[in-house]
Amino acid sequence: MRPTLPLLVQTDFPAIRRRALDTLQVNLGYKCNQTCLHCHVNAGPNRTEMMDADTVQLVLDLLRERRLTTLDLTGGAPELNEHFRDLVRGARALGVRVIDRCNLTILSEPGQEGLAEFLAEQGVEVTASLPCYSPANVDRQRGDGVFERSITGLLALNIVRQQVPQVRAGLARQRSR
């Protein structure tokens, strides 16, 4: 492989300087309740690779030792990891801001009852994506019924937000290329 550092040294491109590490993004596993055609980790319902309890404890240890301020949870559907709630509780007990990259449909999956309330009680920030405003486009990309279930998930989060004042909920618009 060709070394790239000499190429950077000989350019007028501004130097890239790193700041102190404050955010840790953790993929809790590849299992997901959706089958998105565009998934960059090829997650899906048949994937079984999930972070184990020992590794979750290492994450909590790292958060504590490095005094990190933000834990960004992703997957697959991170909520499908059996240690998700313990990790969230542990991080929040350390005063760490937690972001859940949620696909919204997980909120209505069997076994996930009370998830919206849990996220609210823990003060978790939910970052969710919806690739398009069109039900047909979303369902074509993510699976039948995903658009409608996503809207239902947003409504559930909105209801919880109204009941628990400290919950912050936002919707970001992403432009497609």
Model-derived features: positions:
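Conserved alpha-helical substructure of the radical SAM core
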Residues: 2-75, 79-97, 102, 110
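Conserved AdoMet/S-adenosylmethionine-binding subsite of the radical SAM
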Residues: 81-177
